[in-house]
């Protein structure tokens, strides 16, 4: 008599997981919360105690045309104090101020550190094509910042809206160019544009930029708290996606 063939193993289509807790304030086992902004406000950053030993104040360099310097400075100053969050969703939280969150002040770097560009792309960098000029200006700016690397922690790079048609084309992407060069030279950068400078909800803007600046300066705002039954050396890879609907067609945008 023939034995029956084994049934094929079928995995479930999906599994629902509980929202994991995040760990803050290293050394305090009770410093955990599922909400990153509440956790930061209540306990402080995960590495706040050690971060202050090698970064007493977080210094920001500016790269961009002269016309944007004052706006970027004002935006940076707004991160230092409390800001009201006008979003009405459950995630939104009032922003308490940079030093309150991270234990270090947020200041502009010394004047000689900043890199000021001309107002027009035709006067920027070197090369026949606009993309070559932008690439040249980015390379010159970051190479100059490399010579004063001990005088700043992160660079804010401002691209005005009037430059946008030339910053991203089929053959060229200024953002990618900047990030690749910054990675090579060990210079963390945060890109700003007019939309971010004009953003009405200052609380939401402050949260996003403050966490980004802290992390890009070498800090760890939070980390995944230990999960029961999972080895400590386990690595996690997050995968998220959004479905954008346009003309009744679904478009998927994944991000890892």
Indicate residue ranges for each PLM-predicted region.
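Long, low-complexity, intrinsically disordered terminal regions
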Residues: 1-256
């Amino acid at each position: 008599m023939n034995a029956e063939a084994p049934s094929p193993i079928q995995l479930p289509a999906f599994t629902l997981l509980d929202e994991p807790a995040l760990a803050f304030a290293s050394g305090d086992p009770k410093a955990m919360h599922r909400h990153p902004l509440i956790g930061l406000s209540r306990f402080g950053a995960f590495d706040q105690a050690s971060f202050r030993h090698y970064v007493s104040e977080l210094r920001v360099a500016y790269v961009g045309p002269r016309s944007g310097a004052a706006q970027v400075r004002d935006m940076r100053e707004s991160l230092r104090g409390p800001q009201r969050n006008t979003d009405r969703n459950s995630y939104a939280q009032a922003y308490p101020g940079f030093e309150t969150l991270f234990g270090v002040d947020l200041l502009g770097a010394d004047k000689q550190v900043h890199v000021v560009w001309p107002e027009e792309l035709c006067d920027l960098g070197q090369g026949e094509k606009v993309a070559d000029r932008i690439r040249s200006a980015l390379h010159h700016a970051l190479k100059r910042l490399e010579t004063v690397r001990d005088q700043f922690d992160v660079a804010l790079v401002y691209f005005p809206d009037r430059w946008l048609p030339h910053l991203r084309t089929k053959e060229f992407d200024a953002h990618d160019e900047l990030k690749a060069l910054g990675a090579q030279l060990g210079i963390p950068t945060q890109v700003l544009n007019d939309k971010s400078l004009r953003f009405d909800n200052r609380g939401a803007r402050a949260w996003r930029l403050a966490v980004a600046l802290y992390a890009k300066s070498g800090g760890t705002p939070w980390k995944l708290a230990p999960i029961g039954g999972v080895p400590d050396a386990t690595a996690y890879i997050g995968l998220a996606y959004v479905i954008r609907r346009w003309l009744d067609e679904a478009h998927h945008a994944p991000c890892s």
